[in-house]
Amino acid sequence: MAEISAKLVQELRQKTGAGMMDCKKALIETEGNVEEAADWLRKKGISKAGAKSDRVAAEGLVDTYIQPGGQVGVLIEVNCQTDFVARNEAFKALVKNLAKQAAAADSVESLLAQQYADSPGGTVEEFIKQTIATLGENIQVRRFVNFALAEGTQGVVDSYIHTGGRVGVLVELGSQSESVATNQEFQSLARNTAMQVAACPNVEYVSVDQIPAEVAQKEKDIEMGKDDLANKPENIKEKIVQGRIEKRLKELTLIDQPYIRDQSISVEDLFKQAKTKLGEEIQVTRFVRYILGEGIEKQEISFADEVAAQMGGK
């Protein structure tokens, strides 16, 4: 076997833009022949993928997977660089498959290490590298969460995707019996609840009693420091602040929101009505909302710079 020197690896990296370990593996497979190693990387879809993997990926899709029976669900965000690639069918298919596979993962790292279901013999990470090379953009699995009903409990997991994959919600509702858990009205309630969460970006908790004390105290401190209360007597100030705090905390809770399909009732009223119809206690166990690119600082690149970068990458 030919000796694989650091110089050979560096030469192949400069030629292909692939990662160091991928270049070393390619050189081993081709007995140190740089040209053959470059072809090997191209066949594997790795060439130039490494060079693209440090670009900021703030576009993409939020998607979900619900296992048949509604006992397990996944919400996932996969990022790319442009909306153009986000609308590409190959990218959409990748995200769908990743959402399904994430049901059996507990971290992004463990998901990437799985065998990719649609590409036997290769890992998820390897297939993503191939897709990067094919589509020409950085692709990152940013985050995912999976819900599974606890053993011995009844309920359903459902989801809602809004605005073409830019907002996604995963929700779990609990019931007392299997007959209610499989009831169509109960399952429709789960879907409508997910839609409600998507429509209420300020909502973070199911009910006021779930809000941590430190969050409530922070809101109180903010209100107490407002200029319009500076000259108020302390007892009046406390009453005003208490009223504002109660209003603010309700803005953070799901059950206190007006129901989007009927503004005359609250979400809490909706669940009370459902309880009467279904004959047993039901509740929102938990929910999570993803907003595409939330918290990612996007690079501001001029059109000329973008064209130059694309030309240089070819």
From Swiss-Prot:
Keywords, sorted A to Z: Cytoplasm, Elongation factor, Protein biosynthesis
Subcellular location per the Swiss-Prot or TrEMBL entry: Cytoplasm
GO molecular function, one term: translation elongation factor activity
Keyword Protein biosynthesis listed: yes
Superkingdom in the source lineage: Bacteria
Region (Involved in Mg(2+) ion dislocation from EF-Tu): 82-85
GO CC terms, sorted: cytoplasm
Signal sequence segment: none
First-listed, main subcellular location of the protein, grouped into a coarse class: cytoplasm
Family: Belongs to the EF-Ts family.
Role, per record: Associates with the EF-Tu.GDP complex and induces the exchange of GDP to GTP. It remains bound to the aminoacyl-tRNA.EF-Tu.GTP complex up to the GTP hydrolysis stage on the ribosome.
Protein name: Elongation factor Ts
Source organism of the structure: Nostoc punctiforme (strain ATCC 29133 / PCC 73102)
